[in-house]
Amino acid sequence: MESRLFQVDAFAGRPFTGSPERIGPDGSLRKFFMLDPAITYLNHAAYGATPRPVFESFQRWQLDLERQPVDFLSRYSTERLAHARAVLADYVDTDRDNLVYVSNGTTGLNIIARSIPVGPNEEVLSSDHEHGGIDRLFRFASQKLGFTYVRREIPVPVTTHADFIDRFWGGVTERTKVILLSHFTSPTSLLFPVEEICRRARAAGILTIIDGSHVPGQFPLSLRRLDPDFYVGILHKWVCAPKGCAFLYARPSAQGLLDPLIVSWGWAPKNPGPSKFVDFHEWQGSRDVSEFLAAPDAIAFQAEYDWDTVRSQCRELALYAQREVTRITGIPPYHSTPEWAGQVVCANLPRHIGNPDDFKNRLRFEHNIEVSVDVFRDQPRIRISIQGYNTIGDVHALLAALQRLL
């Protein structure tokens, strides 16, 4: 199907000629999600959505906390969190004590940014496709620590992985001490070939920080194979865990570089655990950790419902949606071959739409469609997310609305 949807000239404005009624999930998973049925929801990449069985597990943990807070937090949380980390470690292919749960990707990357050994006359190399919040974080850190934050321009449309790697690596200098790079980009929805970047960086003695916020659950992930120094992934997005569930990975050789963002009992603990890294970052004072304990149930839910197949169906529908929006606008997207794409795709919109927030709100309040509309390099773009609860009918609703509004 990919070869039919995507050829080199696939965005020449010609209509799709396949069988669109057979593209994407069949709608049977919708019953598990609590999203408002009156809304065509095409923005899963923003905050995710949790299926009811996983949400009910989350609530059971919360009730357990309220029944006996001391048992829950003081007596049993360490053991329970260790189990939850073990399940997650198996899912992302690493060892249990290389991971800690954090509330979101921003928290995990703040831990790293405030600890990395880089200062004046040294550089952190990144790209101009990074998440706005993380871009702001490293601009802030550069002012505090004195390093230079370099945003390497990656032209679009991207072409080949080899060209990307050469282009990005061309920004490395003798002052480059750290590389910060998205695995799957938030503003442009591109799967960057970070494995080769990590390999080159390790050979050059450069630390790697990979923002994998959109990767777990959307793509297979092997941290053992990827081998970054630091990796942050979000679980409440594509794994569909409860909100506020993410993880921080640190390679064993790099764990000692990270100071706790919040210093508490894990610093010089009375009863040290097997991992100082976990001690430092897991206990952050009194807080509800129910979302972390429910993460294994989210992983199990997707395994039960053959999520590898669901992902493939979603990706196929996402590529179809991108092609059809491009046919409407006549503006090429950020890539012309499918290896860059996942369940989230972007398509450019004409500049005459005006303010992107206003256009997004017109889709929401005039057409009951929730979808991301923003700007990349002064060009408006729409970002379409396809999850297992979506069907081709959702995409057709969006296409009809765009034809009316454009």
Report the location of each language-model feature.
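N-terminal "arm"/small-domain region of PLP-dependent enzymes with the aminotransferase-like
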Residues: 4-67, 295, 385
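PLP-dependent enzyme catalytic core of the Aspartate aminotransferase-like
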Residues: 28-31, 170, 353-355, 361-406
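Conserved N-terminal alpha-helix of the aminotransferase class I/II PLP-enzyme fold
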Residues: 68-107, 314
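Structural signature of PLP-dependent enzymes
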Residues: 72-74, 276-323
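Conserved PLP-anchoring active-site segment centered on the Schiff-base-forming lysine
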Residues: 97-98, 115-136, 148
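Active-site phosphate-binding strand-loop segment of PLP-dependent enzymes
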Residues: 148-150, 159-213, 217
